[in-house]
Structures are given as C-alpha cells and as structure tokens.
C-alpha cells in the first residue's frame, strides 16, 4: 500500500504535510479502499493517530456503523459525537483510539470552539503526536478553507486525499489543483478503468435540442446584424455581411471553442440570452419530453431519476409543472432550505415551494414532514431513492419517481435504483463526472445496461463539456465510456433494408434499378430510406 509506505518513510519534523492522493473513480469502492488504508496505517504503529475525515452529510447518511463493518473489530473504529469527544480521542494514549472517523467540519472547529477553555498544553500534546489525516472526496471545493484551518492547527501532520475527480490545471479556475494540496498522485483507477472492468456502467448521453439549431442561428444572426427581420438583414450590404457570417457554421459554430492561441471563440449558444432557457414554453417542452420517454427509460417505473436544474426558482417552477400536467408521477425536490428574509418575495416564493413539496410528499406517503425537520426529510428521501433503511423492500406505490435538485445529491449519493439523469444545467469537468456517476451503479445488465443522461440547456456546449470531461477523467482514453448502440443500429438498418427490398419486389423491379411508378410505393420507400 503506497500510503502506508509513505507514512513509514515520513520524517515527522520536516513539516511536509503533502502525503499524496489516490485517484479512484466514483463507484469503484473508493470509500472502503480509503478506510482500509487508514486501518493499515493504524495497525502499522507508524502513526499515533489516523483520522479518517469526510463530509458530515456523508457521515450522517452512511453512518459510523458502516465503517465499523469494514473493521475486524467494532471497537477498532472510534466515532466522535461532538468536538469535545474528538479532542479527547486525539489526546488519548489508549490504542483503541488510534483510528478515528470524524467530519472535516468538526475537525476544522477544534481551535475555534475550544481556544477559550483549552490549555495550550492540550493543543501542544495533540500537535506532537504523529497524525495522519485521510480526506475522502477531497476534490470538494467546500473543503478548501476548512482544510487550511486543519493544516494550520496540525503543522506536522501528514495529509492524504482520495477522490474520483481530481482537480487538474485544465479545470482549476479558482481552485488549487489536487497535487498542490496533497502532493503527487500515488495510484490511479480512472473512470475508464472502472467501466472496462465492469465495476461501474458506461453512459448514454442524449442531446435534446428544445430549439432547432437553425432557429437559434437565424435569431442570433438577425440580432447581431442589428436588423429587424431576415429580409432587412439580407437586403442591406453591411447587415448582410454580418448576417451570413453568423449563418455559416464554419465561421460561428453552435458551441464556443478555445482556439490554439488561447482565445475563446463564441458560439451561437453564447449569444442566446438567459431568458431563452428560463421561460414557461421551454420548461413545458422539457417536462413533456421527460414524460414522453418515462416508461421506456424507467423500465416501467422500476428505476428512478434525478433532474438537476440551474436554480431553486427553476426547480420549484418545474415541480409545479409536473404536478399540473402529470400528477401521476411522484416528484419531489431537494435544495438548500435556508430562507433569507432579506430576499423579500423570492424568499416567500421559495418557502411556498418547499411547503408545497412537503405537503404533497406527506399526502403520498402518510408522513408529517415540515421545514423545521428538513435535514431528516432529506435523509428519508435519499433512503427512499436508494431503497435503503426502512425502504429496502418497499412496494411500488411507496417509490419516488423523480427527484428535482439544484446541487444536492449530485455528489456522494449512491443508488443502483437511479438510472437516469436529466440536466437543465451547465456542468463541466469534475462536477459533470460526479453528476453522471449518480446513474452508473451496477444492476442486472439486461435491465440497466448503462446510465442514461438527457441534457437540454445549451446542448452543443454541453456536448463539448462531456467530451472534455471524459477525456480528462479517463486519462485521455475515452473509448468505451459510452453506450454502444452499433449492434442495435445494424439490426435496425437490416430490417429497414429488407422492408425496402419488399417494396421493389412487390413492384416487380429487380435489384432496385429504378423507383416504382405508383406514388404510394414511392412514399413508402422514401419513409423507409429516411429511417435507414
């Protein structure tokens, strides 16, 4: 194990906190692997304390019991109910307190919570121990400030990160890269490896163009030419030049692109105003598209889906449209329930939306959730969607069909019962891979051959984003990541060809040498040829 080797060779006085990071794709058993690494170090006696840190939400939903199940002995894994208990176990010399599981939030508050009551000697005692921290899901940007605080509190500690989606120079933006924070990559098991080894499923991304490409192109061309109509744009020589430039795909592509000199060339979708993606007509089109394909994609309601939107107001708007048009679908939403009274009408709208969702949910499932207990409501929804806890053997009528979110549940949530992700949201790099990976947990291959993704907003831009993310996170080996429709396509072509042959045979024409004379046969051939 490269982590335990690194710990055994560590000079605890050189203040080098960067132990390295492990890149193991989402769904490959990363959390168990990271936990086992912590256990190996604890057993090796090369460190006084091994602290396994994760997000409090993950710790809350997956529970300490699960981690104790990984261990040989339940007492080998110590939980921490509060900051005081965490401090007590960090100071302890009892061998059973060597391996500690806690949240990164709790660990970051050690100094801030206790500085007034804690003797400097206590902090010094903890700092003098050989501490190893293993951070699960270390790519999360929310961990940034907390990790800095922990590193400052324990300057001699050694830090390791586990992630399915490291941050590289290509996608760092305001984030530091994973290497900057944790050091060198120690081991890699990319999404390409996971799919090829059949540990996770591949993806079937489907682009849905709510607006026809030519409609958008024409709209942008007329606006950029500063014309009031297409006729005016063509008739005026100055306007005409601009109009035809925007109407030419090689001049202005549908999606923007980065040129070799590092400059960004805008695409048609970059010129489209935001309200094109936020109006009722557009939203109803998506709601209808989801419902039209619901039985096919959900395999007759066996599987569930997540629908990620771009904002909370949009999530509420979509929820209401589903309830209005398709009340037979059981739909709910999850997002940050905080009500900011300074936001006025928007805060009221948000509160009304949450109350509506809770009331409908309560009516369906005979529960009594309210905003005050929203965190527990979220836990129940996640268990219902994952068929866990009390919902392991639930009946069909107790299932949830569709969960609408903004950012929640797009990372860290695992359910083999989710097979489809709908996106009215722009995602890139690690956020895209994390969201896609909600759909690719293994199930019976005949019923769930891949994770389905349908994306609507700025579809050509998203298509580029998908290609870029898959290239980066497959280690530049994106082949085999997507559903292979070739066998189905060949079978479909063979059937269409036989049907075309029958049209000519019926008209007594050998080898399709010429078209049949009668209009009906010509029309039938034309239809089959289009399908072919």
How would you label these PLM feature ranges?
Residues 13-37:
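Walker A/P-loop
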Residues 31-33, 46-69, 309-315:
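Conserved Walker A/P-loop ATP-binding site and its immediately adjacent core
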Residues 42, 57-83, 321-328:
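Conserved helix-turn-beta segment of the N-terminal RecA-like "Helicase ATP-binding" lobe
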Residues 69-115:
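Inter-Walker segment of RecA-like/P-loop motor cores
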Residues 98, 251-405:
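Conserved C-terminal RecA-like helicase domain
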Residues 99-135, 140-149, 405-407:
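Conserved RecA-like ASCE ATPase "motif II neighborhood" in helicase/translocase motors
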Residues 172-302, 319-324, 328:
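Interdomain helical connector at the RecA1-RecA2 junction of SF1/SF2 helicase-like NTPases
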Residues 443-532:
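Long, hydrophobic alpha-helical segments
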């Amino acid at each position: 194990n490269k982590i335990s080797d690194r710990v055994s060779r560590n000079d605890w006085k050189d203040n080098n906190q960067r132990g390295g990071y492990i890149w193991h794709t989402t769904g490959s058993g990363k959390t168990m692997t990271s936990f086992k690494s912590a256990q190996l170090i604890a057993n090796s006696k090369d460190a006084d304390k091994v602290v396994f840190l994760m997000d409090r939400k993950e710790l809350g939903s997956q529970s300490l019991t699960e981690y104790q199940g990984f261990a040989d002995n339940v007492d080998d894994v110590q939980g921490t109910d509060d900051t005081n208990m965490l401090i007590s176990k960090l100071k302890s010399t009892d061998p059973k307190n060597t391996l500690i599981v806690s949240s990164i939030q709790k660990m970051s508050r050690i100094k801030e919570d206790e500085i007034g009551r804690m003797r400097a000697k206590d902090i010094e005692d903890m700092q003098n121990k050989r501490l190893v921290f293993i951070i699960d899901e270390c790519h999360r940007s929310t961990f940034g400030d907390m990790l800095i605080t922990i590193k400052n509190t324990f300057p001699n500690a050694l830090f390791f990160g586990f992630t399915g989606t490291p941050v590289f120079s290509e996608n760092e933006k305001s984030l530091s890269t994973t290497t900057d924070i944790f050091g060198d990559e120690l081991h890699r098991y990319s999404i390409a490896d996971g799919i090829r080894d059949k540990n996770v499923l591949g993806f079937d991304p489907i682009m849905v163009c709510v607006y026809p490409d030519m409609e958008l192109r024409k709209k942008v061309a007329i606006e950029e030419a500063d014309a009031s109509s297409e006729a005016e744009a063509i008739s005026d020589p100055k306007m005409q030049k601009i109009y035809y430039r925007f109407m030419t795909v090689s001049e202005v592509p549908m999606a923007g692109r980065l040129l070799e000199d590092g400059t960004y060339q805008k695409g048609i979708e970059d010129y489209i105003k935001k309200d094109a993606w936020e109006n009722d007509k557009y939203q109803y089109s998506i709601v209808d598209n989801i419902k039209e394909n619901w039985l096919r994609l959900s395999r007759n309601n066996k599987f569930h889906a997540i629908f990620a939107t771009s904002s909370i107001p949009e999530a509420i708007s979509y929820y209401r449209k589903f309830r209005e048009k398709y009340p037979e679908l059981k739909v709910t939403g999850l997002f940050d329930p905080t009500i900011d009274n300074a936001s006025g009408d928007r805060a009221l709208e948000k509160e009304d939306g949450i109350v509506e969702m809770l009331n409908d949910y309560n009516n369906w499932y005979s529960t009594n959730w309210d905003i005050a207990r929203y965190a527990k409501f979220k836990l129940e929804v996640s268990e219902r969607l994952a068929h866990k806890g009390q919902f392991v053997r639930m009946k069909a009528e107790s299932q949830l069909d569709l969960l609408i979110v903004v950012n929640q549940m797009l990372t860290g949530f695992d359910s083999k019962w989710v097979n489809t992700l709908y996106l009215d949201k722009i995602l890139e790099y690690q956020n895209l891979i994390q969201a896609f990976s909600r759909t690719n947990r293994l199930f019976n291959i005949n019923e769930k051959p891949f994770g389905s993704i349908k994306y609507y907003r700025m579809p050509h831009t998203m298509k580029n984003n998908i290609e870029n993310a898959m290239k980066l996170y497959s280690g530049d080996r994106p082949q085999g990541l997507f559903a292979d429709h070739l066998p189905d396509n060949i079978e479909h072509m063979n059937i269409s060809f036989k049907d075309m042959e029958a049209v000519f045979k019926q008209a007594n024409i050998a080898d399709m040498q010429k078209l049949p004379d009668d209009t009906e046969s010509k029309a039938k051939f034309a239809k089959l040829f289009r399908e072919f």
